[in-house]
Amino acid sequence: MVRWLYSTNAKDIGTLYLIFAVFAAMIGTAFSVLIRMELAAPGVQYLNGDHQLYNVIITAHAFVMIFFMVMPAMVGGFGNYLVPVMIGAPDMAFPRLNNISFWLLPPSLILLLASAFVEQGAGTGWTVYPPLSGLQSHSGGSVDLAIFSLHLSGISSMLGAMNFITTVLNMRNPGMTLHKLPLFVWAIFVTAILLLLSLPVLAGAITMLLTDRNFNTSFYDPAGGGDPILYQHLFWFFGHPEVYILIIPGFGMVSHIVSAFSGKPVFGYLGMVYAMFSIGILGFLVWSHHMYAVGLDVDTRAYFTAATMIIAVPTGIKIFSWLKGSFSKTFLANSINVLSEAVLTLRERFPRANLYPKNCLINNECIDLVPYGYYLTGTMHYPRYNIILQHMVSLTSYLYGVVVGLMLSDAWMNKKNMNGQARLFLKQSINNAFYLFYTFSLLSHYCSSYPYIVNSRGFIAVAFVTRTLTCFTELYNNFYENGKKCVPSDIYNMLTIQGLSHWICGDGTFVKGGGIYLQAQSFTVIEVVHLINVLIIKFNCKCTIHYQEGKPVIYISSRSVRKLRTELLKHMPMHYKLTGKTSRVN
């Protein structure tokens, strides 16, 4: 417990962000289920006609999903986990600041949930518009608690944004210029800038609302010379960049996933970077397209209509760059993965590229004035949250080997019938002991007993008994049949170049002549033949079966290793093996 409370390790904090986001997602989903149950049929269903309670549930659902699920997961979780690794930094620039930026979120969530139970609850909607959020409509302390919650969440996000900006600018590997940064790092960098510029405006807007409610000011009260439209301008100056704060990290994720599954670099790297910056800049210049119905003059509405349409240009650059990267020669060999990512890309971005009528409404003020408001739920949930969740799931699957440190390694597990726990056993050659201990340093905190080490003349092995965790149970159930390790039926789609590099790193041994032995002794001969066919078809490797002590191993020729060397070296664990003294590949 102390480790997680006081940790300054970026990966630990990233894990905390992801766990917190999952917890918040469950709360937000519970609110969503209540809303859908009430709307499932006409008339009063479950809330006894309490419209204030319905508004409170909608407000809590929106705040939880935006500020406590998507933002912590996309920026805090994946950002902390991947940005230092991608730029070669040992940690974030300000580790203790990183710690406090996370631990501000739990009290912020508690304040938000408390606001739903104080007096009649905060039934203002997520925009918190006055006069609905004023004393006349909400005289209790519920709205005040919601404002304090937003303050804490905003401080957390600003601290994290400063940390990311400093880390990217000052802690890159020597020789890594800005134009060599991975696109996901660029996405987090742009997102951090948007957070740093937009959140202070929101803080000022809700602080003035707080003083209107408690200190007799009249910033938004027309009776005292104020104007509630001022609040809308301030809120949407934050609110529209917030849309891109939520989705730009997804841009970086899609770029990496499409690149990996298409087997080629991202098309138009610089164009993608400048497109993200353009989207971020234009995001600050179009806020009033959310306010066409408040009585803006014609010239103002014409400007915001034109500016909103201009955002389609950098968005189009990104969508067509992704599609150009997807449809390559590798598309035929890896069609399922590439097609799924291409469809994901099309579904996500084409609506905002003015090709889907419902999402064109917000661009054109002449059309928007008539159906204003009815499509907002759809336009937030379909092209935003559904796609964001797909990004998170896709990236988690894609980075499984990086996070866990293993990719279908030559390990095996067995169940201990006494207590249902699993025993994980890894065996490596003596020369590869470094990778073995590196792997177990990642997994050691899951041990319920100290790892048992076996030294022999030709190999070293480590075994430990895991705690009863769902992940090990699923691993055992998915990759073992009758207690024996088996090759998954969809191994063709699962095995990427990154997975192959981890396989070589964990189970590969260089032999005389420059080839590689891939240990596959846990599998049957039929399964080994299937693996060889996958390597031949997918990676164009020349492979044959050899036998060691009567058990099959896969031999990859030196020519194939040379052909794959450039791709394999992109993955950090391969450097010591392909560039060290033991490597015979030049």
UniProtKB/Swiss-Prot annotation:
Keyword terms, alphabetized: Endonuclease, Hydrolase, Intron homing, Membrane, Mitochondrion, Nuclease, Transmembrane, Transmembrane helix
UniProt-annotated stretches for the region COX1 intron 7 encoded: 324-586
CC per GO annotation: mitochondrion; respiratory chain complex IV
GO molecular function, one term: heme binding
Pfam families according to UniProt: COX1, LAGLIDADG_2
Entry superkingdom: Eukaryota
InterPro entries with a match to the protein in the record: Cyt_c_oxase-like_su1_dom, Cyt_c_oxase-like_su1_sf, Cyt_C_Oxase_1, Cyt_c_Oxase_su1_BS, Homing_endonucl, LAGLIDADG_dom
Protein name: Probable intron-encoded endonuclease aI7
